[in-house]
Swiss-Prot record:
The lineage of its organism: Bacteria, Pseudomonadati, Pseudomonadota, Gammaproteobacteria, Pseudomonadales. The keyword Cell wall biogenesis/degradation does not apply. GO terms for cellular component: plasma membrane. Belongs to the UPF0761 family. Keywords: Cell inner membrane, Cell membrane, Membrane, Transmembrane, Transmembrane helix. This is UPF0761 membrane protein PA14_51960. It is a multi-pass membrane protein. It is found in: Cell inner membrane. The chain crosses the membrane at residues 36-56, 92-112, 132-152, 174-194, 207-229, 244-264. NCBIfam families: yihY_not_rbn. InterPro entries: UPF0761_bac, Virul_fac_BrkB.
C-alpha cells in the first residue's frame, strides 16, 4: 500500500515537471487571450449551424444557458448577458465580418492544437487539407452533435420516470451528474482528436474523467473564493466581472492542459519508474538497434526500441531523433519509421563524443551492468579516460593559475 502511495506521489511530481517543461502555463495564457476574442465567433458559428436544422431552432440559447449555468462560476452571469448581446449583433454582420469571425474561430483551434502537439512532442503538425477538414468538422459537426445530444437529454429529463411520484430511485442524482457526463465526453473527444498523435481511447477517457472532476472542484472553489473575498469589486468596481472571468478562463485552460499532460504520459507510466540512464549511453544503445535493423534491411520505430529493451518515453525518443537527424545519421522512411542512412564504420566514437550535446557520464552515473555486448569495453574505456583526466587535471586551481610573471602572454 505504501509503495503504491509513493509511486503515486512520484508520478504526480513527474507530471508537474512535464507540465512546466512543456510550457503549459504559457500556452494557457495564450489560449486565454485567444479565447477572449474567439468565444463570440465560436458561439456565432454554433448558432448558425443549429439554425440550419428546423428541429434545433432555438436550441442555441438553451445550450448557451446550460453551459454558463454548469461550467462557469456564478460570477460569470454578467458576462453571459454581454456575450448574448454580442452574439445577437454578430448575426447581422456582412460576409466580410463572417469571414473574420471564421478566421478567429480557426485561430483558436490552431492555438489549441499547437499547445497539445507541444505536450505530445509532435514533430510534424497537421497541414493543408487534413488540418482544414478537422477544424471544419469541429466547427460544423460539433454544434450539430451538441444540439442532438441536448435534444435527447431534454427528452429524457421530461420522462415521468425521472420526475414526479413515479420517478425511479436515484433519478435526481443521475440528472445532477449529467453536466459531469457532458464534460467527460467533451474532454475525451478533445484529447483523442486534437493531438496529431495516436492516443488510446482508454487513456483519453481516463484523462477526460480526471479533468472533468478537477474542473468541477475548481469551479466550486472558485465560486467560494469570489463570494468570500469580494475585495476585487472594491478595486475594479463595475469592471470586476472582466478580470474574474479572465482568471477563470486561464484556470480552466491550466486544468485542460494538465489533463493533456496526464493523457500523454499514461502510455509511459511504467517508463518513468526506471532508473534514468545517461543520455550518451541511451544514444549508443539506440544507434546499436538502428545498426542491427539496417543490416536486416528494416526500418525502426519506437515500439521496436521497446522490444529491444530500451524503454524510451516519447519525448526522449524525439530528442534523440532531433540530434540523429541533424547529424545525418537517420532519415525518415514514412509512416513514423526511420532508417539508418550513414555508414557507422566511417564514423568514430571520438567524433560522436565531440558532437554529442550531452556530457560524458561520470563513474557514479554509469550503470554497473547493462545487457549489451558493447557496454563492458565502453565502460572500461570511460573509466580509463576519467582516471587519465584526474591525473592530468587533478592539481588545484591555485597550482594551474600560479605564475611568476606580471602579465599574461598570448602566443
Amino acid at each position: 500500500m505504501r509503495e503504491h502511495f509513493n509511486d503515486g506521489v512520484e508520478f504526480a511530481r513527474f507530471l508537474a515537471h512535464r507540465f512546466v517543461t512543456d510550457k503549459a502555463p504559457n500556452s494557457a495564457a495564450a489560449l486565454t487571450y485567444t479565447t477572449l476574442f474567439a468565444v463570440v465567433p465560436m458561439m456565432t458559428v454554433m448558432f448558425s449551424m443549429l439554425s440550419l436544422i428546423p428541429a434545433f431552432h432555438g436550441m442555441g440559447e438553451s445550450i448557451q444557458t446550460f453551459i454558463f449555468r454548469n461550467f462557469v462560476p456564478s460570477a460569470g452571469e454578467a458576462v453571459e448577458t454581454y456575450l448574448k448581446s454580442f452574439t445577437t449583433q454578430a448575426r447581422h454582420l456582412t460576409w466580410v465580418g463572417v469571414v473574420f469571425l471564421a478566421v478567429t474561430a480557426f485561430t483558436m483551434l490552431v492555438t489549441i492544437e499547437k499547445a497539445f502537439n507541444e505536450i505530445w512532442r509532435v514533430r510534424q503538425p497537421r497541414r493543408g487539407v487534413g488540418r482544414f477538414l478537422l477544424y471544419w468538422a469541429i466547427l460544423s459537426l460539433g454544434p450539430l452533435l451538441l444540439g442532438a445530444g441536448f435534444a435527447v437529454t431534454t427528452y429524457i429529463t421530461s420522462l415521468s420516470l425521472l420526475h414526479g411520484p413515479d420517478a425511479l430511485p436515484g433519478a435526481e442524482t443521475l440528472l445532477g451528474l449529467m453536466p459531469l457526463a457532458f464534460s467527460v465526453a467533451a474532454f475525451t473527444l478533445l484529447y483523442s482528436a486534437v493531438p496529431n498523435a495516436r492516443v488510446p481511447v482508454r487513456h483519453a477517457l481516463m484523462g477526460g474523467v480526471f479533468t472533468a472532476v478537477l474542473f468541477e472542484a475548481a469551479k466550486t472553489l472558485f465560486g467560494l473564493y469570489v463570494s468570500l473575498f469580494p475585495g476585487y469589486q472594491l478595486i475594479y468596481g463595475a469592471f470586476a466581472t472582466v478580470p474574474i472571468f479572465l482568471l477563470w478562463i486561464y484556470l480552466s485552460w491550466m486544468i485542460v492542459l494538465f489533463g493533456a499532460v496526464l493523457v500523454c504520459n499514461l502510455s509511459s507510466s511504467r517508463l518513468w519508474r526506471r532508473r534514468s540512464l545517461p543520455k550518451l549511453i541511451v544514444l549508443l544503445g539506440v544507434l546499436r538497434v538502428f545498426h542491427q535493423r539496417q543490416q536486416l534491411g528494416q526500418s525502426l520505430r519506437l515500439t521496436h526500441l521497446h522490444r529491444a529493451g530500451w524503454l524510451l518515453p516519447e519525448d526522449e525518443w524525439e530528442e534523440l531523433l532531433d540530434f540523429l537527424e541533424k547529424e545525418q545519421f537517420v532519415c525518415r522512411a514514412g509512416g513514423g519509421e526511420w532508417v539508418l542512412c550513414r555508414d557507422l564504420g566511417a564514423y568514430s566514437l571520438h567524433r560522436l563524443l565531440n558532437r554529442c550535446p550531452w556530457p560524458m557520464p561520470s563513474r557514479e552515473r554509469m550503470p554497473a551492468n547493462l545487457d549489451e555486448a558493447w557496454y563492458p569495453p565502453f565502460q572500461q574505456a570511460m573509466e580509463r579516460l576519467q582516471v587519465e583526466q584526474e591525473a592530468l587535471f587533478g592539481k588545484s586551481l591555485a597550482h594551474w593559475l600560479a605564475d611568476g610573471t606580471s602579465g599574461a602572454k598570448v602566443t
